[in-house]
Amino acid sequence: MGTTLDIKIKRANKVYHAGEMLSGVVVISSKDSVQHQGVSLTMEGTVNLQLSAKSVGVFEAFYNSVKPIQIINSTIDVLKPGKIPSGKTEVPFEFPLLVKGSKVLYETYHGVFVNIQYTLRCDMRRSLLAKDLTKTCEFIVHSAPQKGKLTPSPVDFTITPETLQNVKERASLPKFFIRGHLNSTNCAITQPLTGELVVEHSDAAIRSIELQLVRVETCGCAEGYARDATEIQNIQIADGDICRNLSVPLYMVFPRLFTCPTLETTNFKVEFEVNVVVLLHADHLITENFPLKLCRT
């Protein structure tokens, strides 16, 4: 066994807020004593923006603006140059989670075209003959809860051939009448999206009904913007030709890391939508879309 580095963060869930102290230990393990030129710890937060393949041709001039946006970057020395004894050595550290100037700590978010990530990187510098050691560890930032109470915004909906948009041959569609409601499209990110759906009538047999959560990511600048919608998760809420006039509950938990409070900045936007998708046996696909506003309470 050679020399290994590890970073252990004090909080088990690794979740921190702006202004808090990030603390833990750097663990150095070695069977022999280790000579080193110093051990440092770097905290970094970046927003990585990426264009989808379909946008690249249109936005070549746009590449300059899609450089990673740095939110936070600071380094502290954990150990001065010297010698570490054999065995396991734990060096405690504390890092204030503070940003400079008008910058904002956006919430951690792992998307497709927008990625907001915070990392701690430990570097042990060694002499020319020995390889430098590096260890990286991710921690999670949550935005501050919004002030005031969340105002519910219930939505009632009906889906019929007449309410559908983008239909080429409306006359060929089988007759159906589906109604339901969402309890709120203003959603606390820690609470599930809930509602119900009732199929009152359908000439064609129903194959399945699904609830689909979609992220809409926009990367933009002076030259233009690219807007892409991608699926986060899909939940089947009914399988087969369900009974008519039966209330089917809608229930969806927002997945951690893959969702964040709805975010709008000068360079990028992260928004969320939910689709109610009904698939009929004649391969007709019916989709009803609802924009959501997510926030942390």
Swiss-Prot record:
Record carries keyword Isomerase: no
Subcellular location(s) per record: Endosome
An example Gene Ontology CC term for this record: endosome
Keywords recorded for this protein, A-Z: Endosome
Keyword Ubl conjugation among UniProt keywords: no
Role summary: Component of the commander complex that is essential for endosomal recycling of transmembrane cargos; the commander complex is composed of the CCC subcomplex and the retriever subcomplex. Component of the retriever complex, which is a heterotrimeric complex related to retromer cargo-selective complex (CSC) and essential for retromer-independent retrieval and recycling of numerous cargos such as integrin alpha-5/beta-1 (ITGA5:ITGB1). The recruitment of the retriever complex to the endosomal membrane involves CCC and WASH complexes.
Protein name per the record: Vacuolar protein sorting-associated protein 26C
Species of origin: Mus musculus
